[in-house]
Amino acid sequence: MELSEEVRQQLLDFQKNEITEYHIYKKLAKSIKEAENAKILDQIAEDELGHYEDWKKYTNEELKPNKWTIWKYYLISRVFGFTFGIKLMESGEKSAQVNYDQVREYIPEIDNWIKDENEHENALIEMLDEERLQYAGSVVLGLNDALVELTGAL
């Protein structure tokens, strides 16, 4: 089936997004000290590379990642924590899924790809354990206790 230029461009955008996310996850995995979290991020990266290869079957093009996006999410993840960075990145991907409807007629297996990607990545992201988040939760609870004590003293 011959793809229109508009559909082909959308597929190239999807493909570029997958290879960019692959590099983001790989970069984060290398920078994380916890072996279990690094392993999970490596697994997500390999999934993204597989999705890139799936899109490449239709576009027949090798694409380079968006280096600016890699650095942006890497820095966000280093400053605010990798869990925050990953969830921010994945929230952007949810809006891209609306565009999948426009190419559904050309790519019959797209529904399976979306389902697999959502289930697998969400399961893996939920497994991530970040010490910084646990610490932040303790700080919030401590501040809450202090506020209760302060209002009780008044």
Language-model features: where?
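Non-heme di-metal
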Residues: 1-142, 147-152
